[in-house]
Amino acid sequence: MAEKIKVKLVKSTNGRLEKHRACVRGLGLRRIGHTVEVEDTPSVRGMINKVSYLVQVEGE
């Protein structure tokens, strides 16, 4: 089983690129301050790297 990491949305997606909004939605984040636990896979890591200026990773 893959390890879990916590991701928190710290900035708004308003006015951001549509691809970046899609990454945030793909991570399961809905609103500022929302934290989700996701599996630590290469695809999830790629989404986090793409929107690193919007999210904060807590489980490293």
Curated annotation (Swiss-Prot):
InterPro entries: Ribo_uL30_ferredoxin-like_sf (IPR036919), Ribosomal_uL30_bac-type (IPR005996), Ribosomal_uL30_ferredoxin-like (IPR016082)
Pfam families xref list: Ribosomal_L30
Domain of life: Bacteria
An annotated Gene Ontology molecular function: structural constituent of ribosome
GO biological process annotation, one example: translation
Keywords: Ribonucleoprotein, Ribosomal protein
One Gene Ontology cellular component annotation held by this UniProt entry: cytosolic large ribosomal subunit
Oligomer and partners: Part of the 50S ribosomal subunit.
Membership in a protein family: Belongs to the universal ribosomal protein uL30 family.
Protein name: Large ribosomal subunit protein uL30
Organism: Alcanivorax borkumensis (strain ATCC 700651 / DSM 11573 / NCIMB 13689 / SK2)
Name of the gene this protein is made from: rpmD
